[in-house]
Structure formats: C-alpha cells, structure tokens
Amino acid sequence: MKHERQTTMDELFGPVIFAYTRKEAIADGVLVDVTETAREAGIKLPTALTRAVFEDYIRVPESLQGFQDEAGRLWDLLWMLAAAIRAKRITGDRGTFKVSFAMPASPPRMGVHKNRLVTLKAVCGPADDGSPCMTVMERTED
C-alpha cells in the first residue's frame, strides 16, 4: 500500500503574507474579551465582542450614567446569547439573537430612556490555536 504525501497549504498557496491574530485584535482593542463573564453566563467557549458592539450597547450612554452599568448591560447580552444557544437558535457556526437595551431618549434627557430591541450575530470560529471561540458582532459586521 502506497501512501501519498499530502500537499501543504504553503505549497498550494505560498507562504502567509500577513496574519492578524485574535490575540492581537484583543490587545489592539478591536475585540473586547468577555470570556470570564461569558463562562459565568454558561457559555463554555472563549468569547469576545467587537468594539462596535461594546461601544454601541455595553458602554453606558451618558444620560443613563448612574442608572445602569457596563457589567449589567454585558450580563444582559451574554445571558441572552446563552439562552439562544440553549434554544438552538445559534447552530452550526453562526446565528442571531435579540437583546433589549435601554437607550437614551431623543432628545437625550438624564435618566430618560427607551428600550431598543437589538439583533446581534454570534459567530463560532477558530481561535489562534485552532480551538473554537465565539465572537459577538453587529449583523452588518463580518
């Protein structure tokens, strides 16, 4: 029985010209690592949010300062993600889930808010070492 040698990726496509790792994205602030809180919410995979999700939904708007905090807003997001995973709305490598966030009224007035139902996307892909990890992003992000 003859074994054929498998062609490597470098042989097929040439050497990697540039790679931007998840670790670098977290260090640069492009991704926000929320793994510890995600584990508390029942999510087993390392988890990160895109900077856009963090700024748009986790960071507390100025008019809601003192009424909400980032930890509570993050918990709401991760709890709803965990519920979507348990309900099998996140299947395969991606899916969407909904979270309600208190957002400033228009025009902004201190302490006055309206609830906004937001649809976010969760993608499961490889971490730098090839193990699975989760990234939460806005639906328009990739």
Positions of the model-derived regions?
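N-terminal "domain-start" segment
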Residues: 1-91
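Functional cores of ribonucleases/endoribonucleases
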Residues: 57-141
